[in-house]
Amino acid sequence: MIANFREIGGLPVDGNRVVKKGIFYRSAMLDRATDEELNELKKLGIKLAYDFRDKKECRGEAPYEKIGAEHRNIPATYKNDKLFKLEKGGSFAMLFYKITWRDVAPTYEHLPIGNQAYRALMKSVVEGEVPMMLHCTAGKDRAGIGISLILLLLGASYETVIEEYMRSTSVQPFIESVIGERIPKIFHPYAFRHFHPFFTVYKELLDTSLNKIISTYGDYGTYFEKEFGITAEVRKELIERYTEEA
């Protein structure tokens, strides 16, 4: 099974409506997918795969042709100075540093504002380039924010957005296996204990993104119009297009 894979079809939005099924998907990276898994993915008819990883993260085989999807790799990354220093410190940094979700919060604060990746994503949503899939490495942070923005655009409640985001707690074993292959085994206990925010999701982190949107723009409608050029009229049309009566 492809890690952290799911769709948001069926989730409730305003007006006693739900997101239509078979349109918006999310997952972790596809590099480790088996041929059988890729064949199942191909059956979904996904036209576009947004890959929010940095170039250096794209180490494995790119299987997008096998699923019949166009691959758009647009990094959705913010350079968090503290985390950048830890990365440069290599494996030995794990012995001396311990991070909390608060150390990751600056990344979440900056991601939804002025981000070229999400601007491209919203343009695709408006232009109807669906079905689409969003992914990064674990499919929990950058892809998580992308899916959250789509849900907010379509009128999902705060509770629905948070609940969907928190489903990514299930991806922890996958992340541990990926990181475990990239660092010496002797450092595994330190990595898993000292860098826990890299392995799971925190409600407080998505709250950081949502609070930044509201503090900057006042409401989501203004955010979508100012950041992405999606007016109230266009948003209404998108809700009609991508949702249906429950």
Please identify what each model-predicted range represents.
Residues 1-133, 146-246:
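Cys-dependent protein tyrosine phosphatase-like superfamily
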Residues 138, 142-143:
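Ser/Thr-glycine-rich phosphate-binding loops at phosphate-binding pockets of nucleotides
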